[in-house]
Amino acid sequence: MADTTVTKVNSRHSPRGAMGQRYLASGKSVAMRLWEAEEADSGEKSASRRDYETVGYVIEGRAVLHLEGQTVRLEPGDSWVVPKGAEHSYEIVETFTAVEATSPPAHAHGRDEP
């Protein structure tokens, strides 16, 4: 029988990850996280590769996604995909708020470490 449990997560009470993200709802195959009011930084952060796929949506602010040699400007209303294993980094240009979903869940098994 399928699990029909409904889980509600209030972001004000969500745990924070090591990089400042708030962990939201999480299932067996996908998890959500919130990047809230991330401040503009002095430049591109170091590139990383993750063993999960990420899709995101910009709520407010601006950022630049550097993805496998491409430059993608992100603004409110934009969404993006970072494939599993792709080299990428983000540069916050203007105080930035976005929500992301990761599959498999980024917070499991230490996948979401800086």
What positions do the PLM features span?
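Short strand-coil-strand connectors
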Residues: 26, 66-70, 93
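Short, conserved beta-strand element in jelly-roll/cupin
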Residues: 49-65
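Ligand-binding loop in jelly-roll beta-barrel domains
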Residues: 84-109
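A short glycine-rich, His/Asp/Glu-containing loop-to-beta-strand
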Residues: 11-47
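Surface-exposed loop/turn positions
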Residues: 28, 41, 78, 86, ...
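Short acidic-glycine-tyrosine-enriched beta hairpin
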Residues: 69-84
